[in-house]
A protein has these predicted regions:
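A detector of single, family-specific signature residues
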Residues: 1-417
Length: 417
């Protein structure tokens, strides 16, 4: 039977507080507080090796709450430290929310750094529902930083566009109406030029119609099939929209212009990130991008979060649960709930990239399109979102199979073929 030394760490920006336990829940030494920097971590390693040498331990397990990135350098140093090479080292970053729930199960405890460290060590001792252990991987981790920052940029872009549309309604209330939009893409080049170069709708209405047509055609790089129709719709928007009070025209115009600049900057960042991600993906052997609609960015987002399939025993059910594609069962006595709800307790980045990939794949693959349509028709409320999540769950199975076999995607033949 293994007898590992268990160490719980309460991580802070300035210091780390450690608690030591053995497999019986006894403390082989008192607590330790060190600075959260390289000298402090070296002091911890020295204390750790002393305890290991004086006791009958055959391994090390260290757990710390994953508070920001304050735990990362500490774990990375431990994973490669030569003084610990003689013992198997397992490092576990704990979700602080789950640690708090485990602490509640231990009764009415005080809130101190030392107790928080002890709770982490005790959770290690029970071995119940431990997360995947930390491994330093120079292949997946750099890619993960890129894909997670892209997630951050994309969400900021969506948020900024929503804010911009709110300001646009104030400037031209009819501009954003679906049946009256003068441009199919409100954030396209021609639309941005109209919004930035005309301070008010009155200026649009005052412009000779032929000049307005030429302006739209030029800003659209001569790609509009009928710029006259766009100009006509724009004039109708100018006629039907509310008039913004004169006192608000200048500030709203400035806010709208700055918001459009921010959108342009975020779109440039997303494009640059997509290029960097594709370059890194070229060095990773995989066949996910052979799935129709499944480009290198979606493949990177999924691969970076999953990492080594061995962490999940190449089990698609474990990966699906890790992504949060898990519906809790609700049963009591003879009652069995018909409605089940998505857990949302998994990795939000992995869930996001699976859902985005599923939305793209269902537009290019007949089997996934049929599955998506079937799920949409099952309900009236939130049909699209529900169908995308269920399609993403279906996609997990295919992704795991391709990552395991490294074979290109082959569409499943129909029964009549």
């Amino acid at each position: 039977m293994r007898t590992p030394l268990l160490v719980g760490v309460d991580v802070h920006q300035q210091q780390n507080v450690m608690s030591f336990l053995d497999s019986q829940g006894q403390a082989p030494r008192g607590g330790l507080t060190v600075a959260n920097n390289r000298p402090g971590s070296e002091a911890f390693v020295a204390a750790l090796t002393q305890v290991l040498a004086s006791g009958d331990f055959d391994g090390i397990r260290v757990a710390a709450e994953a508070t920001g990135w304050y735990w990362f350098h500490f774990f990375q140093l431990l994973s490669e430290h030569p003084a610990l090479a003689a013992w198997p080292v397992e490092l576990y970053p704990f979700n602080p929310r789950l640690t708090a729930r485990y602490k509640e199960s231990m009764g009415d405890l005080d809130k101190t750094d030392a107790l928080d460290a002890m709770v982490a060590a005790d959770w290690l001792r029970t071995r119940r529902s431990l997360p995947a252990s930390f491994t330093w991987d120079a292949g997946y981790l750099p890619l993960r930083f890129l894909t997670r920052y892209r997630y951050h940029v994309v969400h900021n872009l969506a948020r900024e566009k929503a804010y911009c549309l709110a300001m646009l309604y104030l400037k031209a209330s009819e501009y954003i109406q679906a049946d009256k939009q003068p441009f199919s893409n409100l954030f396209g080049a021609a639309s941005r030029a109209v919004l930035q170069e005309f301070a008010s709708l009155d200026q649009v209405a005052a412009l000779p119609f032929a000049d307005l047509v030429e302006f739209i055609d030029a800003k659209g790089k001569r790609r509009f099939p009928d710029p006259t129709d766009n100009a006509r719709k724009l004039c109708q928007v100018a006629q039907d929209s509310y008039r913004l009070p004169a006192a608000l025209q200048a500030p709203i115009q400035l806010v709208l212009a700055l918001s459009l600049q921010q959108i342009t900057a975020l779109e440039a960042q997303e494009k640059r990130l997509n290029t960097a991600i594709a370059e890194r993906m070229a060095a990773i052997p995989q066949t996910l991008d052979t799935i129709p609609g499944f480009g290198p960015v979606f493949a990177a987002g999924i691969i970076a979060e999953i990492g080594d399939l061995a962490r999940f025993d190449a089990d698609e059910a474990k990966i699906a649960k890790y992504a949060g594609f898990h519906w809790r069962r609700h049963q009591s006595a003879a009652f069995e709930a018909e409605d089940t709800y998505l857990s949302r307790a998994g990795n939000p980045y992995l869930r996001y990239y699976f859902c985005e990939a599923a939305n793209a794949v269902r537009m290019h693959d007949l089997a996934y399109a049929a599955f998506y349509t079937k799920k949409c028709r099952e309900v009236r409320k939130h049909a699209h979102k529900r169908a995308i999540v269920l399609t993403a769950r279906k996609l997990v199975r295919l992704v795991v199979r391709l990552l395991t076999s490294r074979q290109p995607y082959q569409p499943r033949r129909s029964a009549t073929a």
